[in-house]
Amino acid sequence: MFDLDGTLIAWDCQLLFRHFVLRREPWRGIFLPVFLAFLPLAGLLGAGGMKRVFLSYLWRMDLEVLAEYSREFAASLMPSIYPELRAKLEAQRAAGDFLILASASPEFYAAEIGRELGFDLTLGTPVELGEFFPDLENHKGAAKVARLIEVLPAAWFENGKLGNCHGYTDSCAGLPMLEIGPNYYADIEA
């Protein structure tokens, strides 16, 4: 299992994707003041609520356009993937391991990044566009674990642990994901 932001790539992909979209549709920059206006409410809204506000720049975007941007964005990130983590990914693929990308990033582009890197399964935050503030369930921390348990075969788990699993993250938010596997690697700075 691999985390994405800060683990496979140095940056927060949400910011990178927003910049990617704004270079193609600069008018969407008008939504930045909306996000800034909600910043004082971040403690009340939480990470999921703020993610909904942040993603307002995608309001009324055609889903086919979003899919195309997601594919182009994923391809553009490939040179930025940490070589050391790419080597670990390739070694695990060569060993026949089932490769999982589990990210809190929106699934519409996380899935494309996973496809580019050859993951067997990619899970991100499912986002339903349409409303000004899109609906989503933030795929972070314990929510990642719940979704992994939901989608992976029950036979892969023993006593709540995912057998023969290796996990990689750079974030404390990824610790619940790592705790379901017996072998994990966290590079977390306090």
Regions found by a protein language model. Name each.
Residues 33, 37-63, 121-122:
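Short, compositionally biased "basic patch" segments
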Residues 75-190:
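C-terminal cap/substrate-recognition subdomain and adjoining C-terminal extension
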Residues 1-45:
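Active-site neighborhood of HAD-like aspartate-dependent phosphohydrolases
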